[in-house]
């Protein structure tokens, strides 16, 4: 809902500046998606016309009495930290000739949505809102996925978080290019896996990772784990027992009192929730 965007603290704080600048500025990516799904989000990314990013971010920092941070001087990405040092907004130059071109370079249609802050309208050039409504994760193009293979794993992370289905073509792409994850930085893979494990639909997602032959590219040891039969205490082989452990943790969480839920929703080291780490710890104990 557009009202969710306007009601956000960060958006309300910068709107007077945006309107006074009289230049198009677009919120892009996950923030727009999450607002349309009625989910809380504080990850605000803004795109401005090519070449305007540095000046725009500098002026916004001055307006907010905040701080200007240069994140990437090659790709012209900047961060404006609010004076409270808790909130921030990232600002980048448009990567295409227009915002429409920029959006077409993104990974999935549900992430290729922009909100024009100046005109207060949503820009959707790849039918992302339809896919959002229908719960579909759809590729914009195969090239966009292969251009940065971590997007293969991002697809599964979004499935875990939202419970969406993959488009038929995306399933083919994910399976076809799974091998490219073998050369992707382990640090990037770890970030996505931790987020995936923290999703409400983690078990179904891992099952799909396995079905599309992506899991064994991420964790080669899984091939041997599947060969370990159940012992006298269990009725499932080690692989499916691990999945069942995760499923039971979720059931425990869903049926817990509010106080317990709040405890597991708290973030600990790495910015991840305790619930995510509990699933990992229990899985490791069962595999030892």
Predicted regions and their residues:
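Catalytic cores of the polymerase beta-like nucleotidyltransferase superfamily
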Residues: 1-288
């Amino acid at each position: 809902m557009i009202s969710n965007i306007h009601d956000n603290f960060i958006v309300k704080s910068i709107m007077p500046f945006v309107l006074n600048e009289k230049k198009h500025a677009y919120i892009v990516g996950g923030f727009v998606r999450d607002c349309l799904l009625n989910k809380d989000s504080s990850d605000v990314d803004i795109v401005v016309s090519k070449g305007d990013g540095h000046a725009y971010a500098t002026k916004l920092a001055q307006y907010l009495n905040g701080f200007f941070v240069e994140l990437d001087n090659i790709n012209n990405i900047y961060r404006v930290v609010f004076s409270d040092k808790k909130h921030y907004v990232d600002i980048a130059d448009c990567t295409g000739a227009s915002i429409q071109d920029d959006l077409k370079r993104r990974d999935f249609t549900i992430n290729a949505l922009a909100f024009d802050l100046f005109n207060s309208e949503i820009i959707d050039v790849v039918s992302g809102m339809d896919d959002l409504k229908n719960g579909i994760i759809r590729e914009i193009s195969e090239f966009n996925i292969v251009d940065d293979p971590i997007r293969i794993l991002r697809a599964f992370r979004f499935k875990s978080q939202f419970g969406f289905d993959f488009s038929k073509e995306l399933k083919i792409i994910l399976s076809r290019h799974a091998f490219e994850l073998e050369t992707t930085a382990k640090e990037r893979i770890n970030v996505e896996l931790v987020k995936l494990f923290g999703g409400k639909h983690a078990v179904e997602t891992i099952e799909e990772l396995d079905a599309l032959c992506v899991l064994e590219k991420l964790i080669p040891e899984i091939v041997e784990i599947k060969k370990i039969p159940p012992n006298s205490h269990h009725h499932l082989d080690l692989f499916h027992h691990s999945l069942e452990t995760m499923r039971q943790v979720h059931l425990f969480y869903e049926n817990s009192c509010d106080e317990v839920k709040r405890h597991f929703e708290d973030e600990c080291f790495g910015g991840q929730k305790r619930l995510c780490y509990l699933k990992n710890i229990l899985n490791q104990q069962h595999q030892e």
